[in-house]
């Protein structure tokens, strides 16, 4: 490919296979043997003949000139010089001609015996240590035993190891003629050492036989270890057998007889001044190999003693090892400066390796970079390009035009004119630029909006001008950012840039479908200022207040004549939508500024009559884009950009110290807080409260004081100048600043965190707050305290960026081959979507979650029976409104999680493309978009786990359940007892743990809502009662969990001893004594309460968890419904919550949390077993009698009680549930939804909106594989990981086939063969005719498998494409596996195609478009006419 530079000769290959190279194939590629270790002559600087840079082997150093100089110039092209043997050709052949070294003895390839899994070792069934003994010439190995016996006189077996002594003794004992026998004679004794012995052994392996033997072993082996050993070996054997289907791939090729020498230009030797040379490390490594090989040759010729030869062979093996992979060896070859040499493997690996440096990222021509400045007068699709830069970029186009116009004759003179910058050049450049956009890119390109196309405009100066609204997408600012410019050259590229990438088309953010080109900073401030309303007060009069105008034109005249103020409230006749939704003229109360703003708004959007903030602007732009078109929206954006800047300037909205108003109540509030703190410290000193409580209370006081002060300050600043205070306007409009920052300017800086020592303690809040604010100034101590936070913030940001970048890289890698490939995969599955709630508060409504998805079933309004949406129909905004209005709790929609497309994903399962708000098209690379959408906001996530101190992070607990809809209550599984109510009367107390309340619609009987009724709650309604919306159904104690007596009787304590298993604590508010269960030293003692019946028999026992408060005394008589125990709920556990980036990584990598919960796998009743080794045993028994036992650490809180009924998937102890458990118990669907929701939660806390779709695409990729449980008659192995599609395909192939059990007298059939029933019948009928024994067969057993959840790194490394996996991580391992199994890469993903230099199979590069012929309508008509003419004949 490299040699033929004509366009036509680029082979369009569509797959690449990899395999082991045979010595013959290496020789076939090679141009000659390198015999000498010399490189170039230090005096003449010419390559030495037969050396590592030899011209005869690799080609001439100068273009068309042989080494001795006999033939020069191009006319001798292709002649081989008779004197020096060099072919006369161009020098670039030295980049692709390969040489070789013939090794005197074979050498094992380090990849196949040093890396795990050890390929050669597994084939021979040898451990790595023993294999090393063979390869490094320490032991002889018996290849063929013959008649030899060992010292004990027992016959030797194949693969026995012998020391040299033993070997010589055996040779002495054997008869003389043994060595004259032929090698194939079974009586001959053969034993060898080193790689030459391995070649012999590997050649003798019959893979099919070995495979059969190992399969038998794996199926029938009793010992676990031997079984896994057999399966591991099987994997290597099967890989080699698989490879032989596509190409020849013999195991003995893992041993090398010939070493290839890579082209000299790829390992250059550069002369430096002063007669020294800089060389590539590879040359040193090759030299060592050649020197040792030549020395060994000489020693063998002079018949040196065996010991010396053996040492030399070992050294040769080591030198070849370090050539291929220098890092694997314990003693790597080092340079003089003690740096390990870079071997061939190192040049592939890592960021600087071949894959990532040269194949995935290349440097390109026709590019420029410069600093960016703002271009406020540009249109949405324009950018300013410096003249000189443009002249250089568009040079070839200008040259062409210069020659066409006849201004110059040659290219050379054209270049001169351009370099002189003659006026005619600018004239031509203006023309060339028309319709030829450029691409602008700002690093880091975190999502696809980091590269956009603009139409260039020539400007003076040297900086690129960028449109201010494009900044958000590029994440650019003008503090010295640089951007790169690229020039699309071909007509297709230009078209794509104009139609797909033009900045004015990229208004929406692909992550969530909301506009991204939203005015920010000055623009928002100007628009906010112009639409704000000001009333006349006694201090200032507003000119023209209350006037009425006929039209906007009239108003503009009045405003220009200074007859009316910008912020004056006026009336105007204008068009807007009435109740019926028609555009009509009406009189509106509004302000002058709003009328001016509405002049820019397209008429279809109605009249916008509100104060504009950043938030409202985003909604307005989204609305306008929906109602009108992209060009109109981009025009509107340009208009409001101008308005915003103009009025920000006219308003003079800067601020001074005077605008920062400190509330005069500040001092008194601080004094009051100090008094309270003193009171608390007094309480502490008197011993009424613990140190921890004191700390929490102090922090709470300061937190609330700070909050109160902030509110006051905000109020003052809001009331100042009618809200026209500059600082307040900046904050309120969302242009700049936050409430926090205003608080630090006007209130007090507040509490600061302690510096955190390395992970041990610290990180808490210092209880003395900073009382000053920035206007007053900080004292030296206060300043010192606050520096810590500032520095930590900067350090964190730097670390975070790298982490987020790496996460994005892994995400892209796992999902890069998800492309929309088909219209409909035809699946019948989907996911059920409900509104997202937190503490009964709706975080994300049902409508938001299903918008733009495809409905799985028909949706009908349960109350009116109205048909809302059909199966496979898109849920649009209108349909969402209907669904929200109806009492529908959940909707089933199609989802990427359940898509069954073989390759990529289908349109119906993906739904709407968020970047266009239309249904996605085939060819869209949704995987990469998903990865970018998740990775891009990664830098905004917090890096650390965050700490919730005291009540600062507390939300008041909810304590009641209210009916959400009116209807009929239906309660399942309810058990109640009469008990005491908190207010003293009696009440119904719930004692069942799984009571469920359903509210049904009176007329239709459709279930409207479904809730769990908590244990211990007081219930106010009966089954079947009619409830009103908002009626309280049950209440409970929000601070304590309780255990309630179900029986009347007498209390008996067991193992409840003061000072051992419980302590007496005094409640500081009431002074009452309470018994609190504590952890006892003696782990055997389990504190238990028994309830005794009439005859002192135990009716019921309750285990008491640590921290429980006893509410009854020993021997006390109790009635039913008595509260026996209160367990304080840990309100806002002050532990650290893993949040932010680490949590996202943990979920995507499917790691198990450090303290996992124990989860029940079945529905059943709980009972407690014994304590074993510090673990409490919990037994769950199902109704069918199935029993599962679980061990829970004693330190973990147990969440269930004796005799509780638990459902599968319920946690038995506290901690987070592992994804593995969810998968095993609730199945793949549940775990996928769990992962999506958990990751969303992290982003939601940071206020980042990302559509669920993107997470679903990635999570789907994590569940591509299944693990084979029982291979049946398939080719799979037990425990093997295979793709779901392959698994289904293999099973379908076998469907209905038969397996021969006994071949009878048939010659065609073998036992174990799989054939169709028809073939079996035919064969048997032949046998029947000949009166022979018939063949018997059984039905095929198909394979069974379990779904597997893989982390994104694992999933990327196991993609089908080895090129993609190798360029990701663990390059050598991936290539090593791929070569052994002779893998074929079908180039289906994006990455593989970038690497081999093809167009990516997405978008316009989809393979189905390749065969399309583009022509004009006339040509088509002519073709049809010709065709018809032919038909008539």
UniProtKB/Swiss-Prot annotation:
Belongs to the RNA polymerase beta' chain family. Zn(2+) 1 binds at residues 66, 68, 81, 84. The RNAP catalytic core consists of 2 alpha, 1 beta, 1 beta' and 1 omega subunit. When a sigma factor is associated with the core the holoenzyme is formed, which can initiate transcription. The gene is rpoC. One of its GO terms (biological process) is DNA-templated transcription. Zn(2+) 2 binds at residues 825, 899, 906, 909. DNA-dependent RNA polymerase catalyzes the transcription of DNA into RNA using the four ribonucleoside triphosphates as substrates. Pfam families: RNA_pol_Rpb1_1, RNA_pol_Rpb1_2, RNA_pol_Rpb1_3, RNA_pol_Rpb1_4, RNA_pol_Rpb1_5. Residues 329-346 have a biased composition (Polar residues). This is DNA-directed RNA polymerase subunit beta'. SMART domains: RPOLA_N. It is an enzyme of class 2 (transferase).
